[in-house]
Amino acid sequence: MKRKMLKRLLTSAFACMFIANGLITTTVRAVGPKTGEENQVLVPNLNPTPENLEVVGDGFKITSSINLVGEEEADENAVNALREFLTANNIEINSENDPNSTTLIIGEVDDDIPELDEALNGTTAENLKEEGYALVSNDGKIAIEGKDGDGTFYGVQTFKQLVKESNIPEVNITDYPTVSARGIVEGFYGTPWTHQDRLDQIKFYGENKLNTYIYAPKDDPYHREKWREPYPESEMQRMQELINASAENKVDFVFGISPGIDIRFDGDAGEEDFNHLITKAESLYDMGVRSFAIYWDDIQDKSAAKHAQVLNRFNEEFVKAKGDVKPLITVPTEYDTGAMVSNGQPRAYTRIFAETVDPSIEVMWTGPGVVTNEIPLSDAQLISGIYNRNMAVWWNYPVTDYFKGKLALGPMHGLDKGLNQYVDFFTVNPMEHAELSKISIHTAADYSWNMDNYDYDKAWNRAIDMLYGDLAEDMKVFANHSTRMDNKTWAKSGREDAPELRAKMDELWNKLSSKEDASALIEELYGEFARMEEACNNLKANLPEVALEECSRQLDELITLAQGDKASLDMIVAQLNEDTEAYESAKEIAQNKLNTALSSFAVISEKVAQSFIQEALSFDLTLINPRTVKITASSEETSGENAPASFASDGDMNTFWHSKWSSPAHEGPHHLTLELDNVYEINKVKYAPRQDSKNGRITGYKVSVSLDGENFTEVKTGTLEDNAAIKFIEFDSVDAKYVRLDVTDSVSDQANGRGKFATAAEVNVHGKLKENAEVTGSVSLEALEEVQVGENLEVGVGIDELVNAEAFAYDFTLNYDENAFEYVEAISDDGVFVNAKKIEDGKVRVLVSSLTGEPLPAKEVLAKVVLRAEAKAEGSNLSVTNSSVGDGEGLVHEIAGTEKTVNIIEGTSPEIVVNPVRDFKASEINKKNVTVTWTEPETTEGLEGYILYKDGKKVAEIGKDETSYTFKKLNRHTIYNFKIAAKYSNGEVSSKESLTLRTAR
């Protein structure tokens, strides 16, 4: 189409567009009557995100009455939704055309409405997928064209979201769904939704372009236990209201029935039960239902062939016979990959069912597990291949029937954005809390409509902004702590709770363990905890009653935890100030708040706000930083689950070490050995049991210590209580570099399993660095024994061994014969920073420090000093002197140096002929990047690499083995000049080859 409005946008002095917080700001004009007054209006957040949206003008204000064209031809439900919106916004419809009024034209592709084609100005929904639409607002006119009636209805929903206080930006939208069926399966166990909940939900689905509502409540007896019986008259009236509301909102009302609990398959009884199915379906069909589902989930019977045969017969005798019924939907008895597949092959039930069930029937599946973290593309490909069709997803989030104390308030998360290759039907199972389920459902609408552009974080923020208005920021604080569902056994799903806050907490513990200044971070956390309490109190005071009823207990829980978190910070500050009285007072408050939280039905922020209190209660400034401890075990489980020994000293209570239980199992004796980074005076070992299971919990122990890792001395034996609480094993102070915990007894969740296994979430040591412990170490020096005159010699400097100190910096002086060598440069090794300076002829001082803030490793080469051989010499001496190490306490320790001899011999260097590169060209050009390629120069003797230039400026030097390079972060549709030159070892650079081109539009 012609982009005359885009041209105007680019050339007008008044046009201004920028992106901020997901909103597009444009300068807007009032239309019809021109007043010359300009206002700012926002192209607001739209849900779902449109496939294509272009701002094509300045925008305008809709007049108080409009001309409506096409209402007689357009989809009735779309027109009704439009009229309802106009009435709610006090916009009247003119009885006769008024040229000074805004004009809105509405219709479908196959309607004969000339005004619609004119207003669309070449944009059309004709070539879009089903349910697609085009929307153009321009020059005081608004045009909405649907590919079909559903598309027109969805165009109206987008129009409703665009209009704010009668202002509408000038936009050009073409939009269509990624997935054909998008919606909800009301399939949770527990308190069913009320009738009003369902009506409200159905309207919400239509507004967010969700087109499927599967009615399958587990607690509706006529869906499951009484599936043979017809609904009573009172229930039929209720069902009719739901069916009608669904039709009005372009939602397929899918009636689900679960006969598997006691259906009979064979003989007269089987025929009777099949007829019950038909009769039940007929009654719903007569009420307007055109979509049906027969479920075999959560039953004991695994008669795969019979299940499929019932479906096939129903499909032939009812679905296809009717002619206007959508494809039948089913859930097999095995409905997750773990149940369906073994060693990459389908299990017997799944194989038989897949081979038998008719290809036209939609088969639902929940992903790798019943409730799971993700659906990777490989998993969808596997199941789609087994069933030889696109699958239908029943995603068990935000459902909470397996963990009722917690609310699932997060976005769709862990779903591959290419899932539509194998899935064309996507539904989510909501919570029994209908109102709060809308947050996740809102993001599900975005994911399933525009999968490729889905961003879970943006979708989540947008959902809360659109649903909660002035309370949105408070709701984000609350919901951020309630996104992760984890019942600590078989079910885990959703984005982690408050990940940014958890990272700050972890940073605090690291700083405290490393004796770093944490005052700024502590103040920041005080602010976070105060904001949590404030947000929850605001929500309690201002949330609508229907939402507050669903979350009041969790709001109280987060308030309690926030207060406990603040008390936990008070404990830490008191420890730092050595104020015992303040510490004990804060500890009592923190413990009481934790006890209150743990005794509550409500659950929230278990690994963040709750865990922080637990961590603070067990924190001790004498704790030796777990991340500096090397830990080994008698055995570790890394096959059956990820539970290595290192997890027992990672500072994370949610990971754990487990002795090897997969075949061949290691059934004892069990022990853990901790190697400390220095010699410490220790007096306490902390044992934190695994939190999610008692299996392997240590109840008997022996603690031994050693200075050399070979000769151990026992310091304490005893027993521990059989519970999940953190335990401390205290003893008289003793010097130790190694600590071993031997397991003398442990519990099991298996009969006769006592002592077989051992586990630990954390095993930590408390103590203080041994005063006056001698720090020793030795320097390493690496270099070739022979070098030719004129060549460079790389001299590697590092540390062979360091004892009783953590190194954060090294200081070396490299000595060389100034008559034989000339200093060239110093080169950093990975993860370190090197600063080198020639302090006098024959001496280079080399400073090495950590780039990451972590201790430097003991490595033979930490830095390389490059010397150029200038004259022949036999046995020229290289030495490292004045060597020292800076530790984590800011102390400096001297360490022993070393030396080495090198022979410098005469050499005959081959003649170097400098030539330019050949065949310099662009192999790929797009909007932001250009990739160039070339052939090496005709002569390569002495070739060291290549220098690349952009618009006359050097941008990169690369090695001689490279023959391509990508210039990145370019501007679109812009002319650039690229050049390349070859660099040789004699210091010469070839002539430059040049390339001029324009990036893509």
From Swiss-Prot:
GO molecular function, one term: [protein]-3-O-(N-acetyl-D-glucosaminyl)-L-serine/L-threonine O-N-acetyl-alpha-D-glucosaminase activity
EC number(s) from the headed UniProt entry: 3.2.1.169
Pfam families listed in its UniProt record: Cohesin, F5_F8_type_C, fn3, Glyco_hydro_20b, NAGidase, NagJ_C
SMART domains: FN3
Coiled coil: 515-543, 573-597
Keyword Plastid: no
Record note on what altering residue 297 to A does: 99% decrease in activity for 4MU-NAG
Effect of residue 401 to A: Strongly decreases affinity for 4MU-NAG. 99% decrease in activity for 4MU-NAG
Catalytic activity from the UniProt record: 3-O-(N-acetyl-beta-D-glucosaminyl)-L-seryl-[protein] + H2O = N-acetyl-D-glucosamine + L-seryl-[protein]; 3-O-(N-acetyl-beta-D-glucosaminyl)-L-threonyl-[protein] + H2O = L-threonyl-[protein] + N-acetyl-D-glucosamine
Gene3D superfamilies to which the protein is assigned, alphabetical: 2.60.40.680, Chitobiase/beta-hexosaminidase domain 2-like (3.30.379.10), Galactose-binding domain-like (2.60.120.260), Glycosidases (3.20.20.80), Hyaluronidase post-catalytic domain-like (1.20.58.460), Immunoglobulins (2.60.40.10)
Keywords: Coiled coil, Glycosidase, Hydrolase, Signal
Keyword Membrane: no
Listed SUPFAM superfamilies: (Trans)glycosidases, beta-N-acetylhexosaminidase-like domain, Carbohydrate-binding domain, Fibronectin type III, Galactose-binding domain-like, Hyaluronidase post-catalytic domain-like
Further comment: Metal-binding observed in X-ray crystal structures is artifactual.
Family according to the record: Belongs to the glycosyl hydrolase 84 family.
Protein name: O-GlcNAcase NagJ
Species whose genome carries this gene: Clostridium perfringens (strain ATCC 13124 / DSM 756 / JCM 1290 / NCIMB 6125 / NCTC 8237 / Type A)
Origin organism lineage: Bacteria, Bacillati, Bacillota, Clostridia, Eubacteriales
Gene encoding the protein: nagJ
